[in-house]
A protein has these predicted regions:
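Active-site-adjacent helix/loop segment of glycosyltransferases
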Residues: 22-115, 124, 128-131
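A short, conserved alpha-helix in the catalytic core of glycosyltransferases
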Residues: 1-33
Length: 142
């Protein structure tokens, strides 16, 4: 089931990741149609959306990454998120810097609970991104 702490952001990714870590397979059909109301809960200019996206993603990575990767990736994310907050402030307003900062504060405050939610087995490797985030922020991938 969905992690109730992930209100409206990244809950489906977390669920699929946990299912994979539990040995389940994820299937899809290209014939299905999904209608998504972008910004239906919070629009992209809303700092609360930024907060939820950053906080939920940090928690999701801690819960699902192999232990040996989690520390290094989260440390790297701390640095990247600083740059991302400046970018978001430029694009959507200064309150987004505070939203990213508070996402990190709340993530670290709830660290024991996130660690307790880790499963016994994390699949490694199961995906490959090859600098996807850099391509996105440099404008070549949207």
């Amino acid at each position: 089931c969905f992690d109730e702490r992930f209100f409206a952001h990244q809950e489906e990714i977390d669920l699929c990741w946990r299912l994979q870590n539990d040995g389940k397979k994820i299937y899809y059909t290209g014939k299905s149609k999904v209608y998504h109301v972008g910004g239906g809960t919070l629009n992209k200019e809303n700092p609360q959306k930024t907060y939820l996206n950053f906080r939920n993603n940090l928690s999701m990575m801690l819960k699902n990454l192999p232990a040996w990767k989690a520390f290094f990736i989260l440390l790297f994310r701390l640095n990247l998120d600083g740059y991302a907050s400046i970018y978001l402030a430029y694009k959507n307003g200064w309150r987004h810097i505070w939203a990213v900062f508070m996402a990190h504060v709340m993530f670290y405050c709830h660290l024991p609970k996130s660690i307790a939610l880790r499963q016994k087995h994390q699949i490694d490797p199961y995906y490959q991104t090859k600098w996807l985030m850099f391509k996105h922020f440099l404008g070549s991938k949207k």
